[in-house]
Amino acid sequence: NGTIIRTDLYGFNNFNYDNLMIAALLSFYMRTNSTKELINKLYETSKTIISSQDDKDKFRTDFYLNSLRKYKLPFTGVDVMRIFALNKASVVVDNKTGERKPVPKGLKQTSINLQWYELLEYELPDINEKEAELYNEIPNLKGMNINQLNKLVDKWDRFILDEYIEPMMYYNLNDVFIVAEIVRLYPEEIKSRYAISKAYDVNVLNSSRSKTADILFEKFYSKFSGLAPEQWKGKKTERTAMSFKKVIFPFIKFKTKELQDLLDKLYKTTIYRVNKDAFSENVKIGDITYTLATGGLHSQDVPMELYSTTPYGDYLTPSSTGGKPFTIYHFDVASFYPSIIGVHKVAPAHIDTNAFCNLISWMKQKRVDVKHSEEEYIDGIAKDILALVLKIVINSIYGKLGFEKGDLYDRLAVLKVTVNGQLMLLMLCEALELDNIHIISANTDGIMVKVYASQEDKFKEITTWWQNITGMQADSDVVHSLIARDVNNYITQFRSKGKLKIESKGALNPMMYSLDLTKGYSMPIVAQAIENYFLKNKPVMDTLQE
């Protein structure tokens, strides 16, 4: 009926700046005797905020800033910088302390990801005679000439003359429109925060996916365990030495000597950290060399262009040069790491194992039920948004096991997931290669396989055996074409419902900069030219010159 039920103010870093400034404005508006006094109060507030932001402890504990945070604003602030994790877009490591410090990504950098039409920076012109007169009223600047003032007065301490207002407002409005564009382009990301907040009685309006996962996990785990948050939060399990004897599952077995030797070596391995340099082994199966590390399995791929040569509707496939036609399958393990946690009861030592693993299994099953449900709304949340929410929480769990400042920290649990995940995939690769079914590529949660018609039944038999022995579930999708630079950067065309569906990853994804706003904008035209060249037979220069 046109009645306003709430007012929400969207901004970029408004959680740490704009909201505090508005609180100061409303607080001092009736307590100052003149506009000049009010402006001075706001100026001092702004300086306090800016000077404190590099010192996290000071920013959190400052009495004045905390009083502003407690001020009841007449609107709800929504910070898109936080929602898209742009306040922690990258990390730098302190050379002296080794501390990892988050680095924010500014609105201008983000606007490049959006391909915003106008990239603006605004700088005040040099101080002129008219402005110089104003500084004569400031004791420590009185009597200085224009050159001296331009050297001494910081740009944030300048007076704003009337003639500066119009270009400054144009610049400010451009910033506002960029924020509006972020909200317009990513409505589901924004809507999900409202839906989650309402359905689960939490506040995630200013939370990134990772923070949202933390908040929901806290709520879900407390329900499953029967423990209040204060009874389990704030704990972690420290490890000094981690023996793989305590890590490897008993069903991990190999048939070939090379892999048996690898397994024996792993049983004798002890590591003291879980970073990238802590552990690495190479092993060859057939023609493919695989690298095992603390993060996940990778095959050492060479650049390749491959096509399934079996017929597919009216789509042309390259000649098999007289050989037998074959199909490339992508054997993808569903939610691999969370599945290992749930099926094989992997949990931090300080957490209730049954409650933790039952929660993981419940979320996985709930997500499957949601995806296949015919209902538009489930638990008061739109079906697609609920599926996204569950995916966010499920996929975050593994990462939380290795986050030192989190409540799930236990590095042995990390190794149980990653090491066994890799060994499981190697069991599958070995079994397939022993039956002359050749692996094309292997990554953390799946493999690509070349299968001839005569091998179809054997392929299904081996993959079914593998799923039964590991407890994992997987799907085999047909790959029409694979264009790969290496294992992490590729273009894939999948055969689906009589059509071709393109999926790209890494440097060969021309839209990566828009899928993840924290990423840099790195020559997407190159990825587009590669895609057009291989999939549309379009010369590279035609793409570049368009």
Question: Residue locations for each model-derived region?
Answer:
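Conserved acidic
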Residues: 2-546
